[in-house]
Amino acid sequence: MRIRVPATTANLGPGFDSCGLALTLYLTLDIGAEADSWYIEHNIGGGIPHDETNVIIETALNLAPNLTPHHLVMTCDIPPARGLGSSSAAVVAGIELANTLAELNLSKEEKVRIAAEIEGHPDNVAPAVLGNWVVGAKLDGEDFYVRHLFPDCALIAFIPKAELLTSESRGVLPDTLPFKEAVQASSIANVMIAAILRNDMALAGEMMERDLWHEKYRSQLVPHLTQIRDVAKSQGAYAACLSGAGPTVLVFAPRNLANTLQTSLQTLEIDADVLLLDVEGSGAEVFR
């Protein structure tokens, strides 16, 4: 059996800790034979465990402690610590592993709830489970979210080779915002969401680049954001914004500009991968 979980981008600018979008990069987990002990084969490196302390197995065992150990093989296109939901993908893969082997028959809603409890909020985990675009909130321990189709457009991911830990990126954020600024930040997010629902990517893109919640603080850790934004806008893109906590920058553009933008971004003197992606519509899947 095979489990496949997509990457995700969170925030989309002003949709801070609320908006998430599934992307066509994947964590894939092949479930092999039963074994005496858990072992997960992978080539990620970076100190990622191969035993039951791996997040995937740990998550599965928290849900189903009596699972029979298996040999697992993980392949992952999602680079860690780049703002593309690698930790959320691992958590969701663990939930799917337990659900599959223990026959828990969890609903998608239950999977989102469990994953959000682990990750703290649903912005990455909800689209990882459900696919497409999700707007969510966690209130008094309960998750509220809406899944909707995202407008058709090109997505160009500028993924620096250097990592940026979420903890470091959150550390530069203020504890509070002045009330008037928070009202303005909220109104920008509201217009962005309404524009997306209306398939108006030009207006949505303008709002994406006017975020007041987090990007102006995080830009000191991601100096290439302004450079990429200038290149993207000069060539007709809708917007460029941080993917999650960064350092990846995601460019939204008309499809006919995708290849040109990719080529232009590849010429920047920054060590990075520049990938053409799409919105992933299915979310986590199990292939039997």
Swiss-Prot record:
Per UniProt, the keywords (alphabetical) are: Amino-acid biosynthesis, ATP-binding, Cytoplasm, Kinase, Nucleotide-binding, Threonine biosynthesis, Transferase
Example of a GO MF term: homoserine kinase activity
The protein's name: Homoserine kinase
Major location category of this protein: cytoplasm
Q: Which reaction does it catalyse?
A: L-homoserine + ATP = O-phospho-L-homoserine + ADP + H(+)
Pfam families tied to this protein:
GHMP_kinases_C, GHMP_kinases_N
Instruction: Report the function annotation for this chain.
Output: Catalyzes the ATP-dependent phosphorylation of L-homoserine to L-homoserine phosphate.
Please state the span of the N-terminal signal peptide per the UniProt entry: none
A biological process (GO) annotation for this entry? threonine biosynthetic process
Q: Its GO CC terms?
A: cytoplasm
Q: Quote the record's binding site residues for ATP.
A: P79, P80, A81, R82, G83, L84, G85, S86, S87, S88, A89
Question: What NCBIfam families does the record point to?
Answer: thrB
Pathway named in the protein's UniProt entry: Amino-acid biosynthesis; L-threonine biosynthesis; L-threonine from L-aspartate: step 4/5
